[in-house]
Amino acid sequence: MAFNMKNRHLLSLVHHTEREIKYLLDLSRDLKRAKYAGTEQQKLKGKNIALIFEKTSTRTRCAFEVAAYDQGAQVTYIDPNSSQIGHKESMKDTARVLGRMYDGIEYRGFKQSIVQELADYAGVPVFNGLTDEFHPTQMLADVLTMIEHCDKPLSEISYVYIGDARNNMGNSLLLIGAKLGMDVRICGPKALLPEANLVEMCEKFAKESGARITVTEDIDKAVKGVDFIHTDVWVSMGEPLETWGERIKLLLPYQVTPELMKRTGNPKVKFMHCLPAFHNSETKVGRQIAEKYPELANGIEVTEEVFESPMNIAFEQAENRMHTIKAVMVASLA
């Protein structure tokens, strides 16, 4: 069946087919090779892209900006302090204004309904740079990274997301694995597993793709034989430190340690993280947590020993944000 990625939104990957996702991954690989070889051709000359950031960002902003510049496009960075968005002007009206000035819009913020509203009213492609529910550009980068670090066919690659699995990373890793026919495992305390309706939807996708889905509290079952272990921060930075106690108590058994990596039984297992990671007490937040919870001085969701080991491929993963975001924009806007 033919498909056309021109003018397509990227909101969650729910509505992308397996073939379309694989096309974006192949294009990402090709664009990455061209950049390294110095043979990249600019496909987005004359294009203007708005970058709306209601949440702070390092990787997503840099990835969108560099990807756009590499391809000849111009970007405008918009944050809540420099715009009327949400204060004097609704997102619906903002979408209708920006859609008349820009060829594409990126949004990084809170509710999935906001990026959906942008897509409904902008009249131009909208790209989700992160919402509370989904992180699709990160997923493309994660799968590209796993492909690069594993000799197996995509359908034979196994990975686990471990920790607080009801966030955008847990949701999105479950979704893309189900779409692509992979062996995907989600592991965490029962209270912090993905919502049942999302799991049910992904199980339907898995039947179509041949994916194997495991959602469990059982750490040994989840990590056995996996090729990759993913995790993410345990608590959102907006939450006060005094609320962390119960969450830390729940999640401490799911901390990624050298012992956990060994429990996979796979000497080639790799560690992945969307970053930023709290792997020591060198950051302001890390120091605050270590003062209150001394047992976490050597890392929260992942220990320093794992993070600084050759098992960690999070920085290649971060670089691939740029290549995959570039592919999304080229496929939609070129």
Swiss-Prot record:
- Which pathway does this polypeptide act in? Amino-acid degradation; L-arginine degradation via ADI pathway; carbamoyl phosphate from L-arginine: step 2/2
Under the heading InterPro entries, the entry gives:
Asp/Orn_carbamoyltranf_P-bd, Asp/Orn_carbamoylTrfase, Asp/Orn_carbamoylTrfase_sf, Asp_carbamoyltransf_Asp/Orn-bd, Orn/put_carbamltrans, OTCase_ArgI
Q: Which residues bind carbamoyl phosphate?
A: 57-60, 84, 108, 135-138, 274-275, 321
Subcellular localization is given as: Cytoplasm
Q: What GO biological process, any one, is recorded here? A: arginine catabolic process to ornithine
- Amino acids binding L-ornithine: 168, 232, 236-237
Catalytic activity, as annotated:
carbamoyl phosphate + L-ornithine = L-citrulline + phosphate + H(+)
GO cellular component terms, A-Z: cytoplasm
Q: Does the keyword Cytoplasm apply?
A: yes
The yes or no answer to whether the keyword Transferase is present is: yes
Q: What is its EC number?
A: 2.1.3.3
Extract the GO molecular function terms from the UniProt entry.
Answer: amino acid binding; ornithine carbamoyltransferase activity
Q: Which UniProt keywords apply?
A: Arginine metabolism, Cytoplasm, Transferase
Q: Which top class of enzyme applies to this chain? A: transferase
Its job: Reversibly catalyzes the transfer of the carbamoyl group from carbamoyl phosphate (CP) to the N(epsilon) atom of ornithine (ORN) to produce L-citrulline.
Query: Record's family?
Result: Belongs to the aspartate/ornithine carbamoyltransferase superfamily. OTCase family.
Q: Which NCBIfam families match?
A: orni_carb_tr, PRK01713.1, PRK04284.1
Q: Which HAMAP family match?
A: OTCase (MF_01109)
> What is the name of the protein in this document?
Ornithine carbamoyltransferase, catabolic
Origin species, per record, is Haemophilus influenzae (strain ATCC 51907 / DSM 11121 / KW20 / Rd)
